[in-house]
UniProtKB/Swiss-Prot annotation:
One of its GO terms (cellular component) is nucleus. Its main location: cytoplasm. Its EC number is 2.3.3.8. Keywords: Acyltransferase, ATP-binding, Cytoplasm, Lipid biosynthesis, Lipid metabolism, Nucleotide-binding, Nucleus, Phosphoprotein, Transferase. In the N-terminal section; belongs to the succinate/malate CoA ligase beta subunit family. This is Probable ATP-citrate synthase subunit 2. It comes from Schizosaccharomyces pombe (strain 972 / ATCC 24843) (Fission yeast). It catalyses: oxaloacetate + acetyl-CoA + ADP + phosphate = citrate + ATP + CoA. ATP citrate-lyase is the primary enzyme responsible for the synthesis of cytosolic acetyl-CoA. Has a central role in de novo lipid synthesis. The modification Phosphoserine is found at residue 24. GO terms for molecular function: ATP binding; ATP citrate synthase activity. The keyword Transport does not apply. InterPro entries: Citrate-bd, Citrate_synth_N, Succ-CoA_synthase_bsu_CS, Succinyl-CoA_synth-like. Composed of two subunits.
Length: 492
């Protein structure tokens, strides 16, 4: 599982499309009819400002107005109803941060967005550009109709939390909420009576049927579309003659990215223009194919925009069952890691910090899960390219190629790919005076170490090679000049 946050726009689109389409998890029949209104969600995205085109420039302001004009064309309803406007960039507690515009006309919403588009915004300790907004209809309601619901996955199953208080001042929901654990075996899904008695004991009885149906439908989508986390706050429940109308006003969600091969088409069709009622200028067929729609986007956390290289590795990672991760911490740093294994990557980063070079640690990342030769080669090239940019440093740079004891990843395969990448960048590695320190163990590790050592000799690279006789992070103090250099591994 790889739980990744998604935008509120995407979460609401998936939920709206599949709420009445996903097969019910419950063996009992629904008691109420779920009337799904037309989906009205407008995603407004602006480009990142640059040094050439800053947010205050006339050119950027013109881009903003062009985006607004496109929104009016695709979503004519924005001019016909009161609206809610808010950034959609994985920002928590937007209401508390003044990042929520309520009960606004389209002109008022535009002005509010206009003042913030492309501008730097500080939210707690994070600072980032506001470039993506969500606009949707405002739902008037009294405060006492706001509730809270959360579904999250744990080893034992899925927890459903429900609280009869919701909104920005909900407080400690973990302490307040009533909780129900849905077992991993969905054949043991709780009965309607259990759901009502466990979660809804503080809710008027006349609303139970509508809310139980909504909870079952919500959980069915959660399972069907491979969510790992889903929070709605507030969930507005407005009493009616037939029970209640339910509205999900604010939503935070995570999907299992590794389920894209299974659910990618479901995520895509829910966000296709036809599903969202978007008026397009081209020919409209009205038909929605199973594989029609845009691929899911997993944005970086607010204040942490992905670099081109990070996005490239993320793309590689999304296309494989292996794991390829890269985060640039300090592009000017002296110490770089090319490490196999999530656990080993933490150990190496920690060892660098313990040896007094935390401020020089350039990247954090890992490759694991038996990536192919081509995937490892592309990953290694990306790291080496980043490492050898800019002006060479007088003190040179250090590259640690390491890992623990591999289980099913073959060091022989991955090291052949890394050796090819070293050959591609041999001139730049020499120019930047890069010393290379290798430690690896696991199946066929001898062949892997032999290949990497021969590459060092072939390309005349300053490269030291160690096997399992060296502690997993034992080469770090040696590479940083904090410990004597020990004898290298020798082929038996």
């Amino acid at each position: 599982m790889s739980a990744k946050s998604i935008r509120e726009y995407d979460g609401k689109a998936v939920l709206a499309y599949w709420l009445n389409r996903s097969p019910s998890i419950s063996k009992e029949e629904y008691k109420t009819v779920s009337a799904t209104p037309a989906v009205q969600l407008a995603q407004i995205q602006f480009p990142l400002p640059t040094l050439v085109i800053p947010a205050e420039s006339t050119t950027y302001r013109e881009v903003v107005e062009d985006v607004f004009a496109k929104v009016e064309q695709e979503h004519p309803w924005v001019k016909e109803t009161k609206l809610v406007a808010k950034p959609d960039q994985l920002i928590k507690r937007r209401g508390k941060s003044g990042l929520l515009k309520l009960n606004a006309t389209w002109d008022e919403a535009k002005e509010w967005i206009r003042e913030r588009a492309g501008k730097n915004q500080k939210v707690q300790h994070a600072v980032g550009y506001l470039t993506t907004f969500l606009v949707e209809p405002f739902v008037p309601h009294p405060p006492n109709t706001e509730y809270y619901i959360n579904i999250n996955s744990v080893r034992e199953g899925d927890w459903i939390l429900f609280c009869n208080e919701g909104g920005v001042d909900v407080g400690d929901v973990d302490a307040k909420a009533r909780k129900l654990l849905v077992p991993v075996r969905l054949s043991e899904f709780p009965s309607r009576a259990t759901i009502a008695s466990t979660l809804l004991s503080d809710i008027p009885v006349e609303q139970h049927e509508s809310l139980v149906d909504f909870i079952i439908r919500l959980y069915s989508v959660y399972v069907d579309c491979q969510f790992t986390y889903l929070e709605i706050n507030p969930l507005v429940v407005i009493p009616t003659a037939k029970g209640a109308d339910v509205f999900y006003l604010d939503l935070a969600a995570k999907l299992d990215q590794t389920a894209e091969f299974e659910c990618g088409a479901k995520w895509a069709v829910a966000r296709a223009p036809e599903s969202l009622g978007i008026k397009t200028s081209g020919e409209e067929s009205g038909a929605i194919n199973a594989d029609h729609g845009p691929p899911m986007v997993f944005p970086a956390p607010f204040g942490r925009e992905l670099s081109k290289e990070e996005a490239y590795v993320q793309g590689l990672d999304a296309k494989t069952g292996a794991s390829l991760k890269l985060t640039i911490l300090n592009a000017e740093g002296r110490v770089w890691n090319l490490v196999a294994g999530g656990g080993a990557s933490v150990v190496y980063a920690d060892a660098v910090a313990v040896n007094g070079a935390a401020d020089e640690l350039a990247n954090y990342g890992e490759y694991s899960g038996a990536p192919t030769d081509g995937q490892t080669y592309e990953y290694a090239k990306t790291v080496l390219d980043l490492m050898t940019r800019g002006e060479p440093r007088a003190d040179g740079k250090v590259l640690f190629i390491g890992g623990g004891i591999a289980n099913f990843t073959s060091p022989a395969v991955t090291f052949r790919a890394i050796a090819r990448a070293l050959g591609d960048y041999k001139d730049k590695l020499h120019a930047h005076k890069v010393s290379i320190w290798v430690r690896r163990a696991g199946p066929n590790y001898q062949e892997g170490l032999r290949v990497i050592r021969e590459a060092g000799k072939k390309f005349d690279l300053p490269l030291k090679v160690y096997g399992p006789e060296c502690h997993i992070s034992g080469i770090v103090p040696m590479g940083l000049g904090k410990a004597p250099v020990e004898a290298e591994w020798q082929m038996a």
